[in-house]
Amino acid sequence: MKQYTVTGMSCAACSARVEKAVSKVDGVTSCSVSLLTNSMGVEGSATDAQIVEAVEQAGYGASPKGTATESENDKANNSLEQLKAAQDALVDRETPKLRNRLIASLIFLVVLMYFSMGHMMWGWPLPEFFNGNHVAMGLLQLLLTVAVMVINQKFFISGFKGLIHGAPNMDTLVALGSAASFGYSVYALFAMTAAQVNGDMDAVMSYMHEFYFESAAMILALITVGKMLEAHSKGKTTDALKSLMQLAPKTATIVRDGVEQEISVDAVKKGDIFVVRPGENIPVDGEIIDGTTAVNESALTGESIPVDKQPKDAVSAATVNQSGFIKCRATRVGEDTTLSQIIQMVSDAAATKAPIAKIADRVSGVFVPAVITIAIITIIAWLIAGETVGFALARGISVLVISCPCALGLATPVAIMVGNGKGAKSGILFKTAASLEATGRTQIVALDKTGTITSGEPKVTDIVPDETFFEETGNHAGALLAIAASVEAKSEHPLAKAIMERAKTDEIAVAEVTDFSAVVGNGLTAILAGKMIKAGNLAFVSKFVKVSDDMRAKAVEFSKEGKTPLFFAADDRLCGIIAVADTIKEDSPEAVRQLKNMGIRVVMLTGDNEQTANAIGKQAGVDEVIAGVLPDGKEAVIRKLKKQGRVAMVGDGINDAPALTRADMGIAIGAGSDVAIDAADVVLMKSRLIDVPAAVRLSRATLTNIHENLFWAFFYNVIGIPLAAGLWYPLLGWKLNPMFGAAAMSLSSFCVVTNALRLNLCRVYDPKHDRKATPDRKNKTNKPNESEEKSMTKTMNIEGMMCGHCEARVKKALEALDAVSEAAVSHESGTAVVTLSSDISDEKLKETVEAEDYKVTSIQ
């Protein structure tokens, strides 16, 4: 998406006009304009010149934020300048300008109010020259009003330009209201002068009361007050983005030819060696090549606890080196750093529109013309009713100045910006406004097991030595671990790495082995201290040694707990069992519990067999476990789940990308792959599952805030316009002075923005106020329908399945059949329980399985 800066917009009608104009340009596929950040995002093949021309023809200004044709080196070299430009764009220049305008306006307005109302209402003294000189009084008021109008000429320039281009905006309403008050007052002044020349003092006094000079000036001053408050509040909504930008280091200390030199961070290139001392910010993303330290990553992840780092660990720009001297190699520089990508995500999200904003957009497109029409009808109606021109004009002007399209236009974007900033501070990044809105509507959360619910790194959980083998050894567990580590040292298997890590932690010495050989799918063999060591699963080791019933029972127990039992034997005797498991993260059960309390159904997807999967699922507390899912099968599972409700898929790996894309909402755990992050709608910077309910909570709070803003914006206009038009005057005698209408208009936008700022108080990790599921949602997502209850199951007995991969092959083949809705396969029991959605012959089922080189012995 190409970004542009748009100038001259003052309300929602302006942004709607720009969006409509650019959308008509040939080659533009989508366009989104943000009134809040004065930015525009455009997708398509149209050139910058075409887009800028379209905006200018609509009566506004535009300029590209960057060039799409830059080379990678250019991008890196210009990253600091781009960052400075982005920071510069967020500087609040509006508030100081508006403050100066307001002060100047008030100086003239106070004098005007003294002469126009002070003497008349409270009897304040006037200079001798003005006593009885009504024409001089009128001329003084005219001059003071002209001064205020000149100071606030921006309203007239913008308002009448919009009217000329057929795109009236909020400034048009203000300009028309003020100009109408001024124009009628000038007419009254000339008429009064003529009456005084003719000696008609009754007419003179009558016309004196028809002066609306103070209204013309007061409208401008009050609207400026509202604009200043609004600009100040809008500046607060971008605080999170500005604070992120301020984190970016300006310089880096690199090592060239053995000499340290300080250079600008935008001059650092990929592969450069840089050093960071304690207390310094890390300048770019890199990998530690020398030294150890603790790094405070709270700027990026929101996690305040420092993370220990050692050689080969990754470090990110803007994080703080707290304790040690480290030397690093730059891996990502310029706009490719994690910090730059976060800033880009947050700013891109601000440039997009939430679907709910379309309501306000549709109204804003016709709002101003409708208000002008209502004002004209109001004036005509009161004149027909026999009221004076002054009375009718006052009612029409009140309609113009009380109507506020700004409140409608700001209702959604300010809440989105604040919500996005709040999320960024907590390490939760929403890529678009639509994703921030949709996350809270999730009904089903599908969790990938590995790396999401679990840590993704197998660890040794149990060491069970065979006491008969280690009769002469004191530390039996340590002795077994020493044998295992010595054999596994030459293996690249993930389970071997878990054993080596445990041996390192326990300071177990590793001996050298010879004749190492890996038996694919079974285990490995090696000679250690003259003994033939065999390691692997039960089926492999039991071919060479006798395994006692107690040890077999222990292995079954481990399997039920989701652990993988590894057997070790020396010559013809069993040494023992070491259980390895991918342990669940500490926060996973609590995260699942919170999601369930929100009324969200939680499903776990895994390629493990049913037994292992159910054990992990039970520990995590999920509602449903779908086991035996191959990497390319996750997308199909998500497709099925989407038939039951809105689905959010949470994953971290490359093989999760298709499922993340298929889901209504893709959520990537931050420690995962770049591919998964690219495919996701929401990125969790911390690898914590507890951030998933936090994201849902923040989304719901933002959506509630948007609804509140839209309600008050609509409610304000629905109540205010009839009151201003004098609808209640015949019944209750209520009428609204144009000055009070202007004051109300000023406060409406300020109130909407202030309400959005309340999102900063949202406690995203506090589950106390979570909404429960409605009965309809629960029934929809948690209960099977009648056709599912009536579905038929068949149990197939299958020979030849040896591992989880075998299970997955059989499961995939069976579920590819149209008549099969689900297949639960277990290689340990040698069965496949098939759930059928329609009739299918046993022969077809048998043929399908045997095509995968397995033998079906019976079907029940």
Language model segments and positions:
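Membrane-embedded alpha-helical bundles of multi-pass transporters
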Residues: 121-135, 164, 183, 422, ...
